[in-house]
């Protein structure tokens, strides 16, 4: 399993709403920018895709199927993740 960070606005990305402790899975091979659950390996890297604002929520995730995960060096895309926790402390974001 791989640990990563997923940024959202109010726990939502497109039509998907995320909850702490829940798993999310699609039965397809992930494709960057098309389908799957996108995340970054570094917490601060998420700011490239989601600029900080009052609705910004940073989630620590586990990639539960890293064998099918695809990457472009900046972000990764999986077909199966689990939301571990919300990171509310800004100091954790910039480490």
Name what the model sees in each region.
Residues 1-95:
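Short, glycine-biased loop/turn motifs at secondary-structure junctions and
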């Amino acid at each position: 399993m791989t640990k990563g960070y997923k940024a959202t606005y109010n726990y939502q990305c497109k039509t998907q709403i995320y909850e702490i402790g829940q798993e999310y899975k699609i039965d397809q091979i992930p494709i960057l920018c098309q389908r799957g659950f996108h995340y970054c390996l570094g917490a601060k890297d998420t700011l490239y895709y989601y600029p900080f604002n009052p609705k910004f929520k940073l989630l620590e995730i586990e990639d539960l199927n890293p064998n099918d995960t695809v990457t472009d060096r900046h972000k990764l895309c999986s077909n199966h993740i689990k939301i571990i926790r919300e990171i509310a402390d800004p100091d954790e974001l910039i480490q």
